[in-house]
């Protein structure tokens, strides 16, 4: 290999060379390639393309020209970095889904939202759009500086005049070395309004600017969730903006629904989005979608249709799609731009300030340019006026001169003209000597004097110049402004919570004696007449039965209070949904109970942070406590202490109150006390309580409930042998806390001890559960209303060894679909979906309910009617006796 001359070899330390070369490369990428200028919002390649279009005269009123010609001209003169980078940049400026206000008017295939590439440059054509002219307007009036191109043979603009704030209007994106920029597009009208507000009030705050500029306005429309991310980005230059597709749930007949997506987030590839949805359906990560198709067309615009299965919840599916697909995504704002050729992170106000200063400079330089031209023209017109006033002498002087140089010198000397004026006279045509031409020159001269005066006023007064900037921006806003496309949903959301992905529905949560828990839809249990046999609520294990149930929404909290005075918390949807006959799962799989700990009460709560609600506790030994509900808002997985009491005591029940109610405590031996809740001072979460009722020997508390002081509610009493009654609350007078209470029922061997004392309004249904797991749902109106001393009427027929274990209230629901199912069952002999009941004689065997003559004959309803008539007579006798015994019981208190 031939040796190079010594003069061409420079020895350098490789570390220094690498450091300096990389810095040079990094600065070249930052300043000359990847970042936009804060003044015109353009990177060098975009600026060179637009200037090249302007130089070729490819204005909107001219025919399209081949893209290859444009690319070749730009590459040869200004941008020697390959044709692909130039063409790709030009294609993006022509895409109405990439630019809010496209700067290139393309003809041919310029790509699609599905990620399809544009046709080759030899097939497509392009020219400028009308709004692009505003970026280049006045470029030839010395409004901006020109610099040498890469080889020094051409001149190119260092920045465009940019008569509208393109940096914010169309946004920008670029990756440099060690930094990147990502600026969202905005609405032209809003941004110009922001510039106008800033020009009138330099001390304006970003919050005030946001009254004009609501937020990004993406070309693909869609939704922006909340303003917190927008405000953070505008204040600091960095932030995350949540974008969401616009989707509607439509009915498509037959009770079926479809999800129709008509707008998608900015920069989302529609085809890949659809592929992602299909992938999730295929992998069974999203259930309930039966069909997925893209119906997008030029006529309808974006339209992606998702058919939903009849039994699926379209809202839940849509929320799952938001969470797991690009139907919802974020836009990371990073407002870095070149300020004085240096990269800088700017906020919204700074971006507008730099643009406004640029416009003031452009208008000032244009005014100076126009003033210079006007003065030059006025100077020429002054010479022409002199010539017209002395036309004969001028002609004589010219005729006497041998050459044009002598003539020019003679005119300058004799009429005191400048060289330019003398040249203009020599160049003047003879037709200018007519009277009409003389008037035109005079008129033009006077107009020029006025124009010069106006230009001088603009340069002399900053406010006049600023007003001119405002007027020109307003004119652009009126010409090109349009309505906002992207809707900003105030209040917004950040991340989708679990509740958003789970349908909200009314459920029943049941808990068995052996602590097995499950949930079922509340519609599983249909309402029956009093005395019915009920439906099988679960297949219980030996010596196990349903002990508690509560109705709530899947989105509500359920608090579990244990016999040891501890509290645990779950969401409704966190309890597994199982079949009606399923025994459930062990409660210890859901919450971490301690040894020998059982659930005393389950309470459904919507808002645990409420400061206006309270919890009232009652123990087996008659102790009560009131505590604010907000004390229980932070319950961890291991639970917390809810109440402290003695070792021989245990928690019986807990009730949710408003703080202004009356407390009712009932015992197994039919004593009931009513006192005002206000007599209970609110205590802390771990505090012990005070005496609520004085118990007779062998008696224990079995029920706790609350009622309004002027309540028209009724006290419902249910005994262990399936009897019950309703008694108005008003029959239980208010007394002092700690008394023995008054009689609430007559206890006999026939009806047994009381297992439930609660209040009802008459608008509820009643769930009565036996130790065998049989559940019956009754309308409260079907239960007779009796006095305090009555035994009650039969609510439920019990088999041998069966007794009522628990009772719960269920709100009535007008379920047309359920009623329709019942009607269908009454007219068909057999259906796979019919509900089943349990025969007392053969527990667990399924038979049909209403209208079964065989069952009626077995149970001898005539005998039951005679028993009920006799019982009603005895109840009336007991009511007469009761009034006589009240005074005696009052004295016991």
Curated annotation (Swiss-Prot):
<dbReference type="InterPro" id="IPR002205">
    <property type="entry name" value="Topo_IIA_dom_A"/>
</dbReference>
<dbReference type="GO" id="GO:0034335">
    <property type="term" value="F:DNA negative supercoiling activity"/>
</dbReference>
<comment type="function">
    <text>A type II topoisomerase that negatively supercoils closed circular double-stranded (ds) DNA in an ATP-dependent manner to modulate DNA topology and maintain chromosomes in an underwound state. Negative supercoiling favors strand separation, and DNA replication, transcription, recombination and repair, all of which involve strand separation. Also able to catalyze the interconversion of other topological isomers of dsDNA rings, including catenanes and knotted rings. Type II topoisomerases break and join 2 DNA strands simultaneously in an ATP-dependent manner.</text>
</comment>
<dbReference type="InterPro" id="IPR006691">
    <property type="entry name" value="GyrA/parC_rep"/>
</dbReference>
<dbReference type="GO" id="GO:0005694">
    <property type="term" value="C:chromosome"/>
</dbReference>
<dbReference type="InterPro" id="IPR035516">
    <property type="entry name" value="Gyrase/topoIV_suA_C"/>
</dbReference>
<dbReference type="GO" id="GO:0005524">
    <property type="term" value="F:ATP binding"/>
</dbReference>
<feature type="compositionally biased region" description="Basic and acidic residues">
    <location>
        <begin position="863"/>
        <end position="879"/>
    </location>
</feature>
<feature type="compositionally biased region" description="Acidic residues">
    <location>
        <begin position="880"/>
        <end position="893"/>
    </location>
</feature>
<dbReference type="InterPro" id="IPR013760">
    <property type="entry name" value="Topo_IIA-like_dom_sf"/>
</dbReference>
<dbReference type="GO" id="GO:0006261">
    <property type="term" value="P:DNA-templated DNA replication"/>
</dbReference>
<dbReference type="GO" id="GO:0003677">
    <property type="term" value="F:DNA binding"/>
</dbReference>
<dbReference type="InterPro" id="IPR050220">
    <property type="entry name" value="Type_II_DNA_Topoisomerases"/>
</dbReference>
<keyword id="KW-0413">Isomerase</keyword>
<dbReference type="GO" id="GO:0009330">
    <property type="term" value="C:DNA topoisomerase type II (double strand cut, ATP-hydrolyzing) complex"/>
</dbReference>
<feature type="compositionally biased region" description="Acidic residues">
    <location>
        <begin position="812"/>
        <end position="821"/>
    </location>
</feature>
<feature type="domain" description="Topo IIA-type catalytic">
    <location>
        <begin position="35"/>
        <end position="501"/>
    </location>
</feature>
<feature type="region of interest" description="Disordered">
    <location>
        <begin position="810"/>
        <end position="893"/>
    </location>
</feature>
<keyword id="KW-0547">Nucleotide-binding</keyword>
<dbReference type="InterPro" id="IPR005743">
    <property type="entry name" value="GyrA"/>
</dbReference>
<dbReference type="Pfam" id="PF03989">
    <property type="entry name" value="DNA_gyraseA_C"/>
</dbReference>
<dbReference type="GO" id="GO:0006265">
    <property type="term" value="P:DNA topological change"/>
</dbReference>
<dbReference type="InterPro" id="IPR013757">
    <property type="entry name" value="Topo_IIA_A_a_sf"/>
</dbReference>
<feature type="short sequence motif" description="GyrA-box">
    <location>
        <begin position="528"/>
        <end position="534"/>
    </location>
</feature>
<feature type="active site" description="O-(5'-phospho-DNA)-tyrosine intermediate">
    <location>
        <position position="123"/>
    </location>
</feature>
<keyword id="KW-0238">DNA-binding</keyword>
<dbReference type="GO" id="GO:0005737">
    <property type="term" value="C:cytoplasm"/>
</dbReference>
<comment type="subunit">
    <text>Heterotetramer, composed of two GyrA and two GyrB chains. In the heterotetramer, GyrA contains the active site tyrosine that forms a transient covalent intermediate with DNA, while GyrB binds cofactors and catalyzes ATP hydrolysis.</text>
</comment>
<dbReference type="InterPro" id="IPR013758">
    <property type="entry name" value="Topo_IIA_A/C_ab"/>
</dbReference>
<dbReference type="Pfam" id="PF00521">
    <property type="entry name" value="DNA_topoisoIV"/>
</dbReference>
<comment type="similarity">
    <text>Belongs to the type II topoisomerase GyrA/ParC subunit family.</text>
</comment>
<protein>
    <recommendedName>
        <fullName>DNA gyrase subunit A</fullName>
        <ecNumber>5.6.2.2</ecNumber>
    </recommendedName>
</protein>
<keyword id="KW-0963">Cytoplasm</keyword>
<keyword id="KW-0799">Topoisomerase</keyword>
<keyword id="KW-0067">ATP-binding</keyword>
<feature type="compositionally biased region" description="Acidic residues">
    <location>
        <begin position="852"/>
        <end position="862"/>
    </location>
</feature>
